[in-house]
Amino acid sequence: MKPKIRTPFFETSVKNYIYGDAVLEFAMAADRAAVKHDVDVLFISPYTEIRRIRENCPHLIILAPYMDTLRPGRGMADVLPEAVKAAGADGVVINHCERPMTLSAIKQTIARANELDMLSFCCADTIEEAQAIAQLHPDILNPEPTELIGSGSASDMGYVREAIRAVKAIDPNILVEQAAGITTAQQIYDFIMAGSEAAGSASGVLRSPDPFALLDEMVSCVRRAKDELALRR
């Protein structure tokens, strides 16, 4: 079975800012924050660290940054879905702006993820692209404008609400996240209060003066938003 994600949740990754032991240390900080604030944290791990993070961070939902759609056999240098799953990944990122894919490839990758009970976490550059991908029914959709990723400038609330409405109109079961350009814990809180089921940050955390402290603060804001939304119901 695929992992059951509790909303709202937090998502982060290391991209290529750090590597080796530093990745594990960051993942362990995310794992501690997940436990401390009782929030689900999705962690996009480099391939080389998936198994180590799985063995040391039992509370994280681990995503591979990409996978191919081939099956066991020939295909040297391709990323085999079964191998990613065996290493400990719970899901896979699909169509990130730094690894863009055709709609056909997105469809095939979602199908392979479903076959292996892996979560499909899709990215989209525009609301129109998000609508097209929503037709393929991924588990999670992150409509983040490419120009904002790593820029330090987040999407405005009008875009956030419009993106959520557009995706939910096609498939209300898709979880919608906002993550591009987030640099503060307050932005995490604001996006979730605006209706996003998740928010995340990678560059904003890792380029901050104290990444571990900011990571914990961001996860705490997910918890705060969750508690406040519960009181409104």
What does each model-identified segment do?
Residues 15, 46, 84, 144, ...:
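Conserved, mostly hydrophobic/aromatic
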Residues 90-101, 141-153, 194-215:
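Glycine-rich phosphate-binding active-site loops on the catalytic face of alpha/beta enzymes
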Residues 109-115, 155-158, 204-233:
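C-terminal helical cap(s) of enzyme catalytic domains, especially alpha/beta-barrels
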Residues 79, 124-137, 181-199:
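Catalytic cores of alpha/beta
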Residues 65-69, 73-76, 104, 122-127, ...:
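Glycine-rich beta-to-alpha transition loops that act as phosphate-gripper elements at the mouths
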Residues 1-79, 120, 128-137, 216:
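Conserved N-terminal beta1-alpha1 strand-loop-helix module at the mouth
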Residues 70-71, 77, 138-165, 174, ...:
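Glycine/Thr-rich beta-alpha phosphate-binding loop at enzyme active sites
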Residues 58-113:
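Glycine/small-residue-rich loop that forms an oxyanion/phosphate-binding "nest" at active or ligand-binding sites
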